[in-house]
Amino acid sequence: FDMPDMTEESFAEHRAAECSSLSVHHNSYLLAAFLLAYRYKKNPVYLEIGRRGLETLMAAYPETELEHSETQEKCRLVFPLAALYDATKDEKHREMLYRVVADLEKVKHPSGGYYEWDTEYRAKYSRVSSTECSLLTENGDPVADLLYSVNWLPIGFAYAYYATGDEWFRQLWKDIVGFC
């Protein structure tokens, strides 16, 4: 979306278009914003955009486009998926949220942080250092990215707790804020 130049016509075009980018990095929080707008304005168009976009990303998950690491993309999905479940209360959306967090938990460090991980090192910036690059050198290195990854988790886990009422998310929130 080119928000500064958004008109009713261009908004309708974007709404009708198929999702052409499977980038969690670039799409997930915009989709969450539509879901929050739906929560407050009750405009079903906002729900449709957020739902369709996140369902498209999750249909490709875990093979979405990666920027820096798998960890980063999973961290960026928690809040949007919690917002989706909060908006719909659909069990399949709840399952999406739990799936991503369960996958993320596989790289949790006892300190409460999350290792950067990139199976097959396929992220866009995994082995490139000409502009910016991942902090990850090798999977298993004791490094957590506080700029691109775990910084998304406090709000994600807090909202997941709000949306689900599950104490597990409250504990995850406590763990990550203790780490940060």
Regions found by a protein language model. Name each.
Residues 1-180:
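Glycan-recognition and catalytic cores of secretory/periplasmic carbohydrate-active enzymes
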